[in-house]
Amino acid sequence: LDSWGSHEFEAARYPNPQAMLDSVHAMNGRFMISVWPKFYDTVKNYKELDNRGWMYHQAIKDDIHDWLGFRGSFYDAYSDGARKMFWRQMDENLYTKYKFGIDAWWMDASEPNVRDCTPMWYRKALSGPTALGTSTEYFNAYSIVNADAIYNGQRSVNPNQRVFLLTRSGFAGEQRYSTATWSGDIATRWEDMRAQMTAGLNYSMAGLPFWGMDQGGFCVENRYVAAQQEFDR
């Protein structure tokens, strides 16, 4: 719970990850795991990246804690060295460690979403400066450089296995890194589902072919329940 960014299975819940992966593959299944570009500031991987100047510091300076109550931040994916280190940490703790048993990567929060429900000006402050320049100029491209880290990282280790990434944010040209994008966490309302159809069409018209959505919604929306009950009566 308190080791976000360690890329390690929690031993109490997953005592034998290799056996779990092997059993999934024995049933002709495929295994995808969610990995965020996020690190609590107490974990080893954070400290390794931070020692090279590859962590964003504003969230730490502002003492921002996430919904679990811990403090952390995101790595600077615009740095080639940071991308290589990020992949190496994933490889050592997940990919090569478990005999290439991870078949796909769910790269969540790749907007980047350092903090939920945050004005754009503060999102940029939390996500920079980057190795390329200000986050005002480069913010939207985070998803593609993060995808670069995993795609080229996995190919360098095991060029014979197909790479597949599911991302929560997209950018022009990102399909070159074997990505599919879904539209993120939506409410369980019909109007939200309809809005995703429009979003998906526009996304695909930009030349990005693989897109999806939370078909059943992600979060229950209660704002209109009381009004609906009044109408029903």
Question: PLM features: residue spans?
Answer:
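Catalytic-domain carbohydrate-binding cleft regions of carbohydrate-active enzymes
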Residues: 1-233
